[in-house]
């Protein structure tokens, strides 16, 4: 567990891109990230987040580096803070199969930005150049380098996990509540046994193979 001083230093380090944008005259800087590009099932979800300048949010980090308990706490903290603006975009399995996962991810990000109650004037995007009328900076591994993108990653991850738990209630045999659609050994075994359901991405290789083998719900 990091001390308060260490957490403050980490927050400052992760605010460099935001500080640079402020110096350039921007004031509403949104971090944008996705969750669910790699899974075999479920939608891809994007989060967008505008943090208020001058306010510390200790503990915010790449969602993958946080424990489920830490991530949930920060998710609720961000949503409940009236000074924080959060948005979410969701693109369905059908759309992923139609346009491919990269384009679907971009579409989810555009949706997330559009859903913000305050329109940003600058975007910090994790790993992708996003064609958008709002000025945009692509940051490789942005969820580890920008506090706004890290916040967006938490929003996207928690929101998607909730969706996958709902899908689990419809199709408990796949274990979506545990692996969230990723290609774990248990998921691949279930796919082999039961075939794909309506929430599987038919354009992804292991799902394609099960369809070719004639295994289906």
Curated annotation (Swiss-Prot):
Catalytic activity field: Endonucleolytic cleavage to 5'-phosphomonoester
A biological-process GO annotation: mismatch repair
PROSITE patterns: RNASE_H_2 (PS51975)
Record carries keyword Disulfide bond: no
Record's cofactor remark: Manganese or magnesium. Binds 1 divalent metal ion per monomer in the absence of substrate. May bind a second metal ion after substrate binding.
Cofactor: Mn(2+); Mg(2+)
Domain of life of the source: Bacteria
Binding site for a divalent metal cation: 33-34, 126
Molecular function GO terms recorded: manganese ion binding; RNA binding; RNA-DNA hybrid ribonuclease activity
Primary location recorded for the protein, binned into one broad class: cytoplasm
Stretches assigned to the RNase H type-2 domain: 27-216
EC number: 3.1.26.4
UniProt-listed PANTHER family: RIBONUCLEASE H2 SUBUNIT A, RIBONUCLEASE HII
Family recorded in the similarity comment: Belongs to the RNase HII family.
Name of the protein: Ribonuclease HII
Source organism per UniProt: Chlamydia muridarum (strain MoPn / Nigg)
């Amino acid at each position: 567990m990091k001390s308060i001083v260490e957490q403050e230093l980490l927050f400052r380090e992760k605010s460099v891109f935001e500080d640079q944008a402020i110096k350039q005259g921007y004031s509403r800087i949104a971090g944008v990230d996705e969750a669910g590009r790699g899974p075999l099932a479920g939608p891809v979800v994007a989060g967008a987040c505008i943090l208020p300048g001058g306010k510390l949010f200790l503990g915010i980090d790449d969602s993958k580096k946080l424990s489920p308990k830490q991530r949930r706490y920060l998710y609720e903290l961000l949503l409940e803070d009236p000074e924080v603006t959060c948005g979410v975009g969701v693109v369905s399995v059908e759309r992923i199969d139609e346009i491919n996962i990269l384009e679907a991810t971009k579409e989810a990000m555009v949706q997330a930005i559009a859903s913000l109650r305050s329109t940003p004037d600058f975007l910090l995007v994790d790993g992708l150049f996003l064609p958008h009328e709002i000025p945009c900076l692509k940051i490789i591994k942005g969820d580890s380098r920008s506090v706004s993108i890290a916040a967006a990653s938490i929003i996207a991850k928690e929101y998607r996990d909730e969706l996958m738990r709902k899908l689990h209630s419809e199709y408990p045999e796949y274990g979506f509540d545990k692996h969230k659609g990723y290609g774990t050994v248990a998921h691949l075994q279930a796919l082999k046994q039961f075939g794909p359901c309506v929430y599987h991405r038919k354009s992804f290789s292991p799902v394609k193979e099960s369809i070719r083998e004639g295994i289906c719900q």
